[in-house]
Amino acid sequence: MVHSKKFRGVRQRQWGSWVSEIRHPLLKRRVWLGTFDTAETAARAYDQAAVLMNGQSAKTNFPVIKSNGSNSLEINSALRSPKSLSELLNAKLRKNCKDQTPYLTCLRLDNDSSHIGVWQKRAGSKTSPNWVKLVELGDKVNARPGGDIETNKMKVRNEDVQEDDQMAMQMIEELLNWTCPGSGSIAQV
């Protein structure tokens, strides 16, 4: 009953059916792709999902062929159309995700304009990164709670700031209050 050939993202149930799932790179959660009769069809479903999530750099079970007529990638499979699979994956991700728009927040230094601040990038290909809090380095210290137009729309109150954001803000304040060797001056917030 158990076949020796192993595919990425595919496993066999005790009663013989094959299941496929993939891990989302940002959410770090498994996305259930379905139950299949054969390991090959489950592997092809995984491949389609991997290409949708990661594009050309996806690690797949079968070779990915780049279409001549368009920039899309094709897998030798007739499981589902890429559009219907994309809609299915989006629906599953929305269901699994507590926060509808997951994001990455980090402390970032902008050397070009001498700024330091909290930088945020929301998940998705159509979103642009933005500054949540920006502080100019040097003699003049200027804190901008909104950052840019997008963040001005999302006024963040102190009681709504999550623990991670509070820690990032604390790190910025500690860095700004740190005395640089050789400078002799302390920046104040």
From Swiss-Prot:
Q: Which cysteines are joined by disulfide bonds?
A: none
Q: Which residues cross the membrane?
A: none
* InterPro entries from the UniProt entry: AP2/ERF_dom (IPR001471), AP2/ERF_dom_sf (IPR036955), AP2/ERF_ERF_subfamily (IPR050913), DNA-bd_dom_sf (IPR016177)
| Keywords recorded for this protein, A-Z | Activator, DNA-binding, Ethylene signaling pathway, Nucleus, Stress response, Transcription, Transcription regulation
Q: Does the keyword Manganese apply?
A: no
Q: Which residue intervals are the DNA-binding region?
A: 6-63
Which Gene3D superfamilies does the record cross-reference, listed alphabetically?
Answer: AP2/ERF domain
Task: Report the function annotation for this chain.
Answer: Promotes cuticle formation by inducing the expression of enzymes involved in wax biosynthesis. Probably acts as a transcriptional activator. Binds to the GCC-box pathogenesis-related promoter element. May be involved in the regulation of gene expression by stress factors and by components of stress signal transduction pathways.
Q: Which domain of life is it from?
A: Eukaryota
Which GO terms of type biological process are on file?
ethylene-activated signaling pathway
Q: In which tissues is it expressed?
A: Found in all organs, mostly in veins, epidermis and trichome bases. Specific expression in lateral root tips.
List the induction conditions: By wounding in cauline leaves, stems, and siliques, but not in rosette leaves.
Question: What is stated as this protein's family in its record?
Answer: Belongs to the AP2/ERF transcription factor family. ERF subfamily.
Q: What's this protein's name?
A: Ethylene-responsive transcription factor SHINE 3
The record's GO CC annotations read:
nucleus
Compartments, as annotated in UniProt: Nucleus
Question: Flavoprotein: present as a keyword of the record?
Answer: no
Q: Which molecular-function annotation in GO is an example for this chain? A: DNA-binding transcription factor activity
